[in-house]
């Protein structure tokens, strides 16, 4: 077989592999980003608290505007989910978390993404912890739920 033919076949196979891998990675990445976010934001809130944060992420994705068009876009948007801020104590925790640590968060993320778990926040796109002063944006939004130590707004 000629070198050119070998390179052409190899390139085609690699291109197909790369396309499939990219598609798989994007699906896996979306759930991983959600799992890491809900772990970082609500791991002390139990399953219901993590589900609520996952619901906020999906509600923002569904809005498909300023927030971003994908889970990854939404959670990595600067200053939206504090666990991704470089100066946040949770940033290193979520980036280093292993599969065992993320197990419950990943299960919740997968179920929220698939629609198996409903939105328990009343369509919330925002939330904040009860331990901090109410952000200014709460004045222009409606409170939809209190779940654990978080207040949710739409």
Question: Which stretches of residues belong to each language-model region?
Answer:
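Bacterial extracytoplasmic/cell-wall-associated proteins, especially those involved in peptidoglycan
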Residues: 25-154
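Single-pass alpha-helical membrane anchors
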Residues: 2-22
């Amino acid at each position: 077989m000629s070198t050119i033919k070998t390179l052409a076949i190899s390139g085609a196979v690699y291109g197909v592999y790369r396309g499939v891998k990219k598609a798989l990675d994007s699906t896996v990445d979306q759930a991983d980003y959600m799992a890491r976010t809900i772990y970082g934001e609500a791991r002390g809130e139990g399953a219901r608290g993590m589900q609520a944060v996952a619901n906020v992420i999906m509600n923002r994705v569904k809005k498909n505007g300023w927030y971003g068009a994908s889970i990854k876009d939404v959670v990595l948007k600067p200053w939206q989910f504090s666990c991704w801020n470089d100066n946040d104590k949770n940033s290193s925790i979520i980036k280093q978390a292993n599969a065992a640590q993320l197990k419950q968060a990943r299960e919740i993320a997968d179920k929220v993404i698939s629609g198996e778990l409903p939105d328990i926040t009343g369509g919330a796109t925002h939330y904040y912890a009860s331990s901090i002063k109410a952000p200014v944006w709460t004045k222009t939004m409606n409170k939809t739920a209190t779940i654990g130590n978080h207040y949710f707004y739409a």
